[in-house]
Design a protein with these regions (language model features):
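Structured surface interface patches that mediate subunit assembly and partner/cofactor docking
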Residues: 2-11, 33-38, 42, 65-68, ...
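Active-site-adjacent scaffolding segments
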Residues: 1-121
Length: 214
């Protein structure tokens, strides 16, 4: 089967770039945005979403992978950092950056790309919450879209190939299959909304009812 995945070194590079630009962006946000609600995340604020963003690499480094991707696993990340300020969280993320960057090239495929896909999803979620549009053409978006293509190539849905072959931007493909587009938005970008809805129903995400522009 053809693989659509980005090369491991590109995946690792994309995560390092994502981490650095997200840290830089968040160091400058107004104090009243720290506890702003992040749309279509599990009732998380900006700060709590960052808890998850650093919690995933923390758990990887600690070998704490039991229940990986489940709500229990992700909520534990938020809980253990519940008393940390945003500045403290960003410092932690920065401090483990070099270590996780060296480890990512050793992640098996496609897990390495899925790791970037998740982080990229939440970077864009935060951007939407704080009104900081950007990084739509970032390397991490290419990596994320390629992970989606690889996922679709191996999917059992009889019309998954239709989504795979659709002419759509990397950003819209990544956000649509990441559960960050309403069905109307999915249709508007040229994808079959019924097929996307059925595929997303089998993923740990869901189709939003209110439009998300990032």
């Amino acid at each position: 089967m053809t693989t659509y995945l980005s090369p491991p070194d590109v995946v690792a590079q994309s995560y390092g770039e994502l981490r650095r630009r997200t840290i830089d962006m968040l160091r400058d946000i107004p104090a009243d945005m720290v506890e702003a609600q992040v749309p279509h995340c599990p009732s998380w604020t900006v700060r709590e979403t960052v808890c998850h963003l650093i919690g995933v690499p923390e758990d990887v480094l600690a070998g704490n992978m039991e229940g990986v991707t489940t709500e229990t696993w992700t909520q534990a990340q938020v809980h253990r950092h519940k008393s940390d300020s945003l500045e403290e969280l960003l410092n932690i993320w920065e401090s483990i950056g070099d270590t996780i960057d060296l480890l990512i090239p050793q992640f098996p495929e496609p897990i390495n790309s899925q790791f970037v896909f998740d982080a990229n999803a939440h970077e864009q979620d935060i951007r939407y919450a704080i009104g900081s549009r950007g990084a739509r053409d970032a390397l991490s978006v290419t990596v994320s879209a390629n992970w989606v293509r690889n996922f679709l190539a191996g999917h059992s849905h009889p019309q998954a190939k239709e989504i795979l072959q659709a002419e759509v931007s990397d950003f819209d493909l990544f956000r649509s299959l990441g559960g960050r587009r309403t069905l109307a938005q999915v249709r508007a970008c040229g994808l079959n909304d019924n097929v996307v809805n059925e595929i997303v129903a089998g993923m740990p995400v869901s189709i939003p009812t209110q439009e998300i522009s990032e």
